[in-house]
Structure formats: C-alpha cells, structure tokens
C-alpha cells in the first residue's frame, strides 16, 4: 500500500488543480483508516489551505476531517490554519471550514474552545446561511463534549 500512497501523493505537486484536489482528497480518505500510511505527507497537506484553487482548499478541509475522525490529537497546533479558512472568499470553502471544528469539537473540544467566540460571531454575521448553521453546529458539538 505504501507504494500506492506515494504515487497518489506525487499528484499533490501537479500544476493541474483537479489532480491536486483528487490527491489531497484520496490521502484524507486513506488517512481516516490508516494514518500511518499518510503520515509522511500529513504536514505537507497544510500548504493546500492556501492553494489558489478553491476546490483544492475544500479538499484539504475534507481530508483533514477524515483524518481527524480517528486521529484528532495531531491537529492542536494547526487550528489557526482552519480559523483562517473560516474567512475564505469562496462560499463553498467557508461552508465546509466550520465542519473541521465540529469534528474536532466532538473529539478534542479543548482544540476548539479558543475559537468558540469567533464561530459565534461568524454564525451571526456571515452572509451565507449554511456557514452560519455550520458554525452553530461546531459550537454545539464542542459544548456537548
């Protein structure tokens, strides 16, 4: 499996956004079930939080959610990256960004608590209804844990 993961990861360096998007997404799906298989590439995934293509940024969030499902403890120092994505100019990225806070709020609420005020503010001010709802969901997940 390691060879296949390496081949998938090689597409992360592609100049073609669709290939980067798919590679990041695949690494997240693999990492959900076997973090050790993607661990060598994990920190490198964070560069996609600022990718020029919104779909790649969205895939980065999805990949992070997948990995965080079973390996949440590794995300503590990286929360500022996700906080920045809450302000992304792309609606779809902003709609998904609160979901990593929800996933981690259930598993490691101490990672999310410092961001509850920000999530609350966005839940009251963002122009996008889904963003507001997802921010509230992240707050509720954190409070319930």
Locate predicted features.
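Alpha-solenoid helical repeat architecture
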Residues: 12-15, 49-52, 86-89, 123-127
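Alpha-solenoid HEAT/ARM repeat scaffold
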Residues: 21-24, 58-61, 95-98, 129-133
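Structural signature of alpha-helical solenoid repeat scaffolds
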Residues: 28, 65-66, 102-103, 140
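Extended alpha-helical scaffolding segments
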Residues: 91, 98, 102-114, 122
